[in-house]
């Protein structure tokens, strides 16, 4: 079956924003205009097409990235709708990894908000080209120029408007296109019929100034045009579009559009901008990977190259079972064929291939380079795994996910719930790499850990709804960590003789702090003093030992371990003995390494009316918070600070009470830092160590 849409006419894009910027409504309008839905669902009515999980419809927020395929003016869009709540940044992270471009939606009244900064940073990490849609221009207090300025001020990004709104708030009626210097007025109906009008006289001067600034900014990305511009020649409209496109594709320049998705104004022009400025799979750099021999290699967006893809999301569908979402980077995949999971070394059969519209499924025969689809039948594939043609092995760059910062204990309500709970938790952990579950060895309780209170609320809710498991939930606890402050060298020896075959394991390991780099293992054993299989066993044993720190039993992080020596016994050596020996070496070394407890520190931004500014500053300081600065926004103040997570439980209620419900805050994980002695002593006391 031949490809229906060329690669040039394909766009893989994400819609990203702060919670409540109107992102899901914008996506709804896009799906309406691209012919995917025939009745628009409003988020505040709980009827949105993309928010298809029951919890999303109740809470009016987007939790999982629903992937959908849509069509616009002979172009195919694969759209990923991503969540705007900080507890779900993993969803944003994994979407950005497989996208070629994104639309960042801002609230026209607030401009750049804290979660916008987080998502923007993630997009910058993956060098994702972006265009910006300033939404809610009909809202009281909407200010387009302020919003554009906030992109430069708060994100340090080079942005310029390519549109100018006509009016604002209730008087927002249309848009001036600064590239073509045309003005449009909207009728406000769902079809978004735009009538071309004269540029209003009171905006003509401003539009001309903004256009000349746009031309000046855009020609920087095209040398030939720069020369033409400096020679005083006229830059044509196609040339200007080409220069803007170059700047966008390089993730260096960010054009800004205006509109109101809810009031049906400006979304069709946004779709045109996606085609004009965001890249096709051919415009972005080829994906890199590693061959079995360790050499670096690339895969290009080409149907004739060997098949390679990255699994970026796993979820359980009530009708078809396990669904694995994947992005094809090269080649073609046909349903019913076998693929190699090169990350795990497993061969798997792709039963069916589905293209998704929110949670509706269309079965397709083949999927091509540059496409996004979901596979049924992959049993062992998880997020971040590479899928390839088994004759052409490669492992593509994977994804890195943050550690959970909050945990709580779960107890099943009945015996029947207990039997189902284990299965439910393992399925949910398979879907979400930032969700962990384990059994506390001392209490026997089941512990779940995640990125925030809302994250864990939704996990518990999903267990009840999807798996019919009722649980009692304990109070949230902070996920502390441990680390070392000094280097040390230690020997670990495990020898057991009990008649017949014994056990023998012996290693010498050098440990040192590895700040912010996680666990690192280095093998410096020479001359075959310890065989490779026993060295690997020592590594596994050490990693297991690190999950239970010596200070208070919390996982130890940021440790570099170098195995430098050891010995073997011809008969008695076995893998288990080396696992135990490595754990002994760690225990011995910890006596000299000054192990300490780390606590999660959060970036906290509080926005309050001016009259509460002093109260909030005092309150944050009383929570061991470090105030980093404040910013005036209208008649409100935004205070930026870093506060230990343990001090932030119940803060929503606290803030509500002393600001009469007029304050709000956002909290995002920043880093782990050493806990003060008094706090550490309290933690150790509670742990019973």
Swiss-Prot record:
Location relative to the cell: Cytoplasm
UniProt-annotated binding residues for GTP: 17-24, 81-85, 135-138
Domain tr-type G: 8-282
Entries under SMART domains matching the protein: EFG_C, EFG_IV
Protein's GO biological process: ribosome disassembly
Top-level taxonomic group: Bacteria
One Gene Ontology cellular component annotation held by this UniProt entry: cytoplasm
SUPFAM superfamilies: EF-G C-terminal domain-like, P-loop containing nucleoside triphosphate hydrolases, Ribosomal protein S5 domain 2-like, Translation proteins
Keywords: Cytoplasm, Elongation factor, GTP-binding, Nucleotide-binding, Protein biosynthesis
Main location: cytoplasm
Keyword GTP-binding: yes
Gene Ontology MF terms: GTP binding; GTPase activity; translation elongation factor activity
Keyword presence, DNA-binding: no
NCBIfam families per the UniProt record, alphabetical: EF-G, PRK12740.1-5, small_GTP
HAMAP family recorded: EF_G_EF_2_B
Family to which this protein belongs: Belongs to the TRAFAC class translation factor GTPase superfamily. Classic translation factor GTPase family. EF-G/EF-2 subfamily.
Biological function: Catalyzes the GTP-dependent ribosomal translocation step during translation elongation. During this step, the ribosome changes from the pre-translocational (PRE) to the post-translocational (POST) state as the newly formed A-site-bound peptidyl-tRNA and P-site-bound deacylated tRNA move to the P and E sites, respectively. Catalyzes the coordinated movement of the two tRNA molecules, the mRNA and conformational changes in the ribosome.
Identification of the protein by name: Elongation factor G
Gene from which this protein is expressed: fusA
